[in-house]
Amino acid sequence: AFGADLFAQSKSPKSGLLVGGGVAGLEAARAAAEMGHRVTLAEAGSQLGGAFRLAGLQPRRAQILDLIDWYERQLMKLQVEVKLNTYMDAAEIATFGADEVIMATGSLPPETGFQKALAHLEELPGIANGNVFSAEAVMAREARPGKRVIVLDEAGNWKGAGTAWKLAEDGHELTIVTPAAMIGSEMQRTAADFPLRRRLAQLGARFVTESGILEWSGKAAKIT
């Protein structure tokens, strides 16, 4: 609704420390500053945006990074103190001296290979053999997959499908596995739905639907 983003000024402004510079942290910092609070935002990395910035590295998605640029301008206008490359542990947070602390550090991807579609397997058999990477690690170029890659598209959204598209455009031979009836199943209500699957097919990706990964050897997978 119009005016829904307007904030009433606080009658007793406080100092606030916000830890984490992803989109959630940026919005929390903006909202608090709009209400008149004195806000310091600490981000462990060298840039604001968190995982959202990685999403902007996927093909045809660079425009979403305009949101991060907008937040940076808003925080500057609202005089939010932004500290990059600033990791804060519990002791540092406790001694910072802020009236209020907001934690917006997000979460890390699981390292077990757990699949909701195969809930009886708490961990992917063979994951200790290595060469299993998160989408975040791939997009951040912290992981370097080989020529042939299996992508598990369990959530059916941009995280899996967009990362697969990036890998395919980089020349990798892809097999995309999903427990759903189609790749990117949760994107059916968006304009990207059909064009995404068509582009992946054009790039030679193989689709394996209504399936999961039963076992990983380090070089090959057993698919149900």
Annotate the PLM regions.
Residues A1-G16, F133-K147:
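A short, basic/flexible loop-to-alpha-helix module at the beginning of a structural domain
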Residues G16-T40, G160-A168:
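N-terminal Rossmann-like FAD-binding beta1-loop-alpha1 element of flavoenzymes
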Residues G16, V39, V132, V149-I150, ...:
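Conserved hydrophobic helix-helix packing surfaces used for dimerization/oligomerization
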Residues K11-A24, P145-N157:
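Beta1/beta-strand and adjacent pyrophosphate-binding region of the FAD-binding site
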Residues P110-G113, L118, K159-G160, G184-S185:
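Glycine/Thr-rich phosphate-binding loops of Rossmann-like dinucleotide-binding domains
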Residues H37-A51, H172-G184:
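Glycine-rich FAD pyrophosphate-binding loop
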